[in-house]
Amino acid sequence: VIRTPSNEESETTPSSKCQFDLANVLKKEMEELGICDVTLTDTCFLYGKIPATPGYENAPAIGFIAHMDTVSDYCDHDIKPTITENYDGEALALGQSELVLSPEMFPHLKTLKGRTLITSDGTTILGADDKAGIAEILTMVERMNKENISHGPLCIAFTPDEEPVP
């Protein structure tokens, strides 16, 4: 687990140097996946391109972007995810905390009945914003490579600090 909390007090980009730790790991993974022109800037912006497959060179480029930081307001270490299999559609207690996710407050939960849910235990953040986005983007690239999926030009970027530094 690579911790990447942003620092609201910082006046630099990135607001926390630990975001470079994740960026360096992602850079290597992007290169291993065959992403071209992978670049990590001195302000921790990471980006690369995937050329179009034959016959799709004139298709419009599509960009995928996610940020590497997590919020700093909550505990972001010793994360204890809770996995609820076959969710019953009722209120969902977050671990031993007093926090509850209720379908009344979050109506979308009703559509997830029978699914597997991953939440925090209520004492820490889960860190899925936006590391889940990063995982989805890289998994998409891996799958496109493995399954030889045709596509137009693709651009991928991972940024530091979702919220701008003042």
Predicted region positions:
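Short, intrinsically disordered, charge-balanced linker/junction segments flanking boundaries
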Residues: 1-2, 162-166
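N-terminal capping segment at the start of a domain
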Residues: 1-16, 119
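A non-catalytic alpha/beta surface segment that caps or lines the substrate-entry region
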Residues: 11-59, 63-65, 69
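Short beta->alpha junction loops
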Residues: 15, 160-161
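Self-splicing inteins and homing endonuclease
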Residues: 46-54, 114, 153-155, 162
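Active-site metal-coordination/substrate-binding segment of hydrolases
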Residues: 56-151, 158
